[in-house]
Amino acid sequence: MGGTIARNMSRAKRLLVVGALCLGLAFALNGCSQAPSQNAPESADGAAQTDQAAQNETRTFTDSAGRTVEVPAKIDRIAPAGHTATQVLLTMAPDKLVTISTELTADQAKYLGGDYANLPVTGAAFGAKGDLNKEAVAASGAQILIDTGEIKDGMKEDLDTMQQQLGIPVVVIETKMEDYGAAYEKLGELLGMEDRGKELSDYCKAAYDETVSVMSKIPE
């Protein structure tokens, strides 16, 4: 029995390595060259009115918890609900972030470039800390709060409660260590970035398959 437990622990550690590698490779592929979202002044009243009309349009989206949520048809301003969500969104749509969950280190800020280190730090909505700064999220002008991670019991109710408190849509995208590709495809659907989601999905799937193949040949 001890051997079985050890093998399971070894497999779990390997999956964690693969998941971390996938995110790292996605960061490298992205380059994070896009700047975070800024609300630039409109050059003409007509353009402003057109943009406002577009912002008011909505559609429905079914998140990974099975909740049907009314979301903006065009999403330009995102607040991540936690640290994993920040990492995933930095690879998927860095230009749309208006907050981050935790302060960046000097090395992270240098690597990412842009003004990410200057974005408001809003904490995490769920988990052990659950220290989301709701006032800062509201002040950021975020259109939506996006969480990522494992789908757990009671999550639907927690997400609904958070949505009521914030007054903006709150959705969750499941991220499994063995299938980050599916998360990127789901994000692509949500953000209207299907091509980008497919690109990152394919990249993660290829990286996962190759890494698992290599690690399977290493004696336990």
Spans of features found by a protein language model:
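Bacterial N-terminal signal peptides
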Residues: 18-28
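Bacterial N-terminal signal peptides that target proteins for export
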Residues: 4-19
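Structural recognition of the beta-strand scaffold that forms the well-ordered cores
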Residues: 79-81, 98-101, 144-148, 170-174, ...
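Bacterial lipoprotein signal-peptidase II cleavage site
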Residues: 28-47
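A short, structured surface patch at a secondary-structure boundary
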Residues: 85-140, 144-151
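Conserved H-X4-D acyltransferase segment
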Residues: 65-92
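Post-signal peptide N-terminal segment of mature Sec-exported envelope proteins
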Residues: 41-60, 66
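Extracytoplasmic substrate-binding proteins
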Residues: 60, 68, 157-220
